[in-house]
C-alpha cells in the first residue's frame, strides 16, 4: 500500500465516526474507486460480507420485540400485505423491463421491508455480487432522500393526522433514518407511531431472508443440485432480539451495540462503494432507478389510499 492509498485509509477512518452517513459513505467509496485510489490487493468482497453479517446481528439489539408487537396490532395486516405485494410486484415489473433478477430482488426487498438493512440481510442469502448490492443501495438511498422532503409536504397538503402520517411513513419509506426524519418533522405522535411500526416491519427481515435463500437456491441451481446456503447470521439476529427482550436490565449495553452496528454498516457501505466504478454503473443503465421508483410510487399511493379510506 503506497501513498496514493492514503485517501482510502483516511476515508475508512472517517466512516468510523458519526460525521459520515450511509449514503455519503457509499458515494465516498464510489469516488475513490472511480479515481483509482482503492488498494487493488484488498479482498473487499470478503471483508464486506463478514462485516455486513455482524452489523445485522448488532442491529437486532435495537429492536424491542414485545413493544413492537403490542403497538402494531392494528397495522400488522397492512404491513404483511404491502411486503408481499411489493415483492410480487417487483417480480412482475422486473420481467417487463427486463432488469437483472438479483438486483431487482434486492431493490424489492429494500422497498418492502427496511431499505439498506433489508438489502444487507438478503444479499448474502441470495449470493448477490457487490455491484448488484451497490446498485440496489444507491437506488434506495436516492428515493430515501426524496422521501425525507416529499412526505411531510404531502402530509400537510392532505391534512393527515399524526397517527395516519406516522403509519404511512413507516410503510412507504425505506430506511429507518428517513422514516424517523420525515416523521419527526411532522410531529411527536407521528414519530412515535412511525418508529414503532418501522421496527415491527424490520422483523420481516428474518422470514424474507430465509425464504430468499430457498428460492434462489432452487431458481438458480445447476440441474437443481445447487447447495442451499442459509444466512445463519439471521438466527443470531433473532437471538439478539430475544436476548434484549428477556434481559432488559442491560439496555445501555444494547444501545451501545446497536450504535456500533449502525456505524459498522456505514463502513460496509463504504467498502461496497469502493468495489464499483462509473463504468460498472453505466453498464447497468437507468433500469434500477426506474424499477425502484415504480415500486415506491405504487406502495406509497396504495398504502396512503388505504389509510385515507379506513381512517
Curated annotation (Swiss-Prot):
Which parts of the chain span the membrane according to its record?
Answer: 10-32, 51-70, 75-97, 104-126, 136-158, 165-187, 202-221, 228-250, 254-276, 288-310
Descriptive protein name? UPF0324 membrane protein VV1122
Compartment list: Cell membrane
Primary location class: membrane
Kindly state one GO CC term assigned in the UniProt record.
plasma membrane
Which terms are listed as keywords in the entry? Cell membrane, Membrane, Transmembrane, Transmembrane helix
| Taxonomic path | Bacteria, Pseudomonadati, Pseudomonadota, Gammaproteobacteria, Vibrionales
Please report any disulfide bonds recorded for this protein chain, giving both cysteine positions: none
Its family remark reads: Belongs to the UPF0324 family.
Q: Which organism is it from?
A: Vibrio vulnificus (strain YJ016)
Membrane topology is: Multi-pass membrane protein
Amino acid at each position: 500500500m503506497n501513498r496514493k492509498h492514503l485517501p482510502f485509509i483516511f476515508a475508512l477512518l472517517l466512516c468510523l465516526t458519526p460525521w459520515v452517513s450511509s449514503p455519503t459513505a457509499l458515494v465516498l467509496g464510489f469516488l475513490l474507486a472511480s479515481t483509482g485510489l482503492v488498494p487493488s490487493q484488498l479482498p473487499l468482497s470478503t471483508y464486506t460480507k463478514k462485516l455486513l453479517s455482524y452489523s445485522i446481528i448488532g442491529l437486532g439489539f435495537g429492536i424491542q420485540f414485545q413493544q413492537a408487537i403490542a403497538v402494531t396490532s392494528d397495522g400488522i395486516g397492512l404491513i404483511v400485505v404491502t411486503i408481499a405485494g411489493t415483492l410480487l410486484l417487483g417480480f412482475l415489473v422486473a420481467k417487463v423491463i427486463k432488469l437483472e433478477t438479483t438486483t431487482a430482488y434486492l431493490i424489492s426487498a429494500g422497498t418492502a421491508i427496511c431499505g439498506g438493512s433489508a438489502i444487507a440481510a438478503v444479499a448474502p442469502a441470495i449470493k448477490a455480487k457487490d455491484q448488484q448490492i451497490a446498485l440496489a443501495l444507491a437506488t434506495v438511498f436516492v428515493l430515501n432522500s426524496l422521501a425525507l422532503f416529499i412526505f411531510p409536504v404531502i402530509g400537510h397538503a392532505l391534512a393527515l393526522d399524526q397517527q395516519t402520517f406516522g403509519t404511512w411513513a413507516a410503510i412507504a419509506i425505506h430506511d429507518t433514518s428517513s422514516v424517523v426524519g420525515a416523521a419527526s418533522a411532522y410531529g411527536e405522535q407521528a414519530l412515535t407511531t412511525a418508529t414503532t411500526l418501522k421496527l415491527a416491519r424490520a422483523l420481516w427481515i428474518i422470514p424474507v431472508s430465509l425464504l430468499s435463500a430457498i428460492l434462489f437456491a432452487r431458481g438458480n441451481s445447476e440441474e437443481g443440485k445447487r447447495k442451499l446456503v442459509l444466512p445463519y447470521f439471521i438466527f443470531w439476529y433473532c437471538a439478539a432480539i430475544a436476548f434484549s427482550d428477556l434481559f432488559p436490565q442491560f439496555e445501555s449495553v444494547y444501545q451501545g451495540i446497536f450504535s456500533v452496528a449502525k456505524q459498522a454498516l456505514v463502513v460496509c457501505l463504504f467498502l461496497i462503494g469502493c468495489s464499483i466504478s462509473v463504468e460498472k454503473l453505466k453498464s447497468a443503465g437507468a433500469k434500477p432507478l426506474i424499477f425502484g421508483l415504480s415500486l415506491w410510487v405504487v406502495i406509497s399511493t396504495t398504502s396512503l389510499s388505504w389509510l385515507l379510506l379506513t381512517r
